[in-house]
Amino acid sequence: MKNEKIVVLYGGDSPEREVSLKSGKAVLDSLISQGYDAVGVDASGKELVAKLLELKPDKCFVALHGEDGENGRVSALLEMLEIKHTSSSMKSSVITMDKMISKEILMHHRMPTPMAKFLTDKLVAEDEISFPVAVKPSSGGSSIATFKVKSIQELKHAYEEASKYGEVMIEQWVTGKEITVAIVNDEVYSSVWIEPQNEFYDYESKYSGKSIYHSPSGLCEQKELEVRQLAKKAYDLLGCSGHARVDFIYDDRGNFYIMEINSSPGMTENSLSPKSAAAEGVDFDSFVKRIIEQAQ
């Protein structure tokens, strides 16, 4: 309802602050242009509770990325204040933020996902790893400090860099096309195929503007149905709600591997979720409207 007061939460203090500011501005501009009573609030600092109590919004559009928007604290706060919001619950956010916990749940349910374990000093020293592998923080997003590692020397460097962001995981490397699917509650949108600027879809590839996106992805009808069903099942198994995105690798044997679930995806007009929606004829403003109207 357009007579409701909406707060767009963006910014914050995570390493993904700059990306979040862009998402928040795009969403806020869209809501205002559509006639919504919307204001933006930078979640940086310690004044968020006071700002929300002062504004008394009916709904919050969560455009925070990284720990600020995806570790469950913002969801818990909004739920405590009885404010409807566009992201997953506190419990689901905690699960999806931790890639290892997410992976363990998916593997328990026999969902296709690459094998992984925590990387430690001892494991680095053992030198018994079959390369290539992926090394990344177990929490975080935007592929910050994520590496494709091909040797023990590269492993040591990757471990050192990734450990700056907390616990580190090492994951089986899967070669194939990078595919993603956006979901808003029961609405599963078209898959998008990403051709990254670099060897894989790392931070630079995501924000340089030089990667190529195919939306729709060009999958045959059967494979499109399969990837959408896998995305929705993963979304449901991890307890997601609202807007989320599921990332896959599609190998040359026709197998999909679930890489991760993002509970607060980017929301600029060039972000992946809007591209997923646009492939089905849903423009950016309409997509923003669908997300906010379904806030829970």
Curated annotation (Swiss-Prot):
Pfam family, one: Dala_Dala_lig_C
Functional pathway: Cell wall biogenesis; peptidoglycan biosynthesis
Entry-linked Gene3D superfamilies: 3.40.50.20, ATP-grasp fold, A domain, ATP-grasp fold, B domain
Keyword Lipid metabolism: no
EC number: 6.3.2.4
Cofactor dependency: Mg(2+); Mn(2+)
Keyword match Nucleotide-binding: yes
Domain ATP-grasp: 103-293
Key words, A-Z: ATP-binding, Cell shape, Cell wall biogenesis/degradation, Cytoplasm, Ligase, Magnesium, Manganese, Metal-binding, Nucleotide-binding, Peptidoglycan synthesis
Binding-site residues, Mg(2+) 1: D247, E260
Any Gene Ontology biological process: peptidoglycan biosynthetic process
Compartment(s): Cytoplasm
Gene Ontology MF terms in the entry: ATP binding; D-alanine-D-alanine ligase activity; metal ion binding
Catalytic function, reaction form: 2 D-alanine + ATP = D-alanyl-D-alanine + ADP + phosphate + H(+)
Classification via InterPro entries: ATP-grasp, ATP_grasp_subdomain_1, D-Ala_lig_Van_CS, D_ala_D_ala, Dala_Dala_lig_C, PreATP-grasp_dom_sf
GO cellular component, one term: cytoplasm
Binding site for Mg(2+) 2: E260, N262
Residues binding ATP: 129-180
Cofactor note: Binds 2 magnesium or manganese ions per subunit.
HAMAP family on file: Dala_Dala_lig (MF_00047)
Function summary: Cell wall formation.
Family: Belongs to the D-alanine--D-alanine ligase family.
Protein name (Swiss-Prot/TrEMBL): D-alanine--D-alanine ligase
Name of the gene this protein is made from: ddl
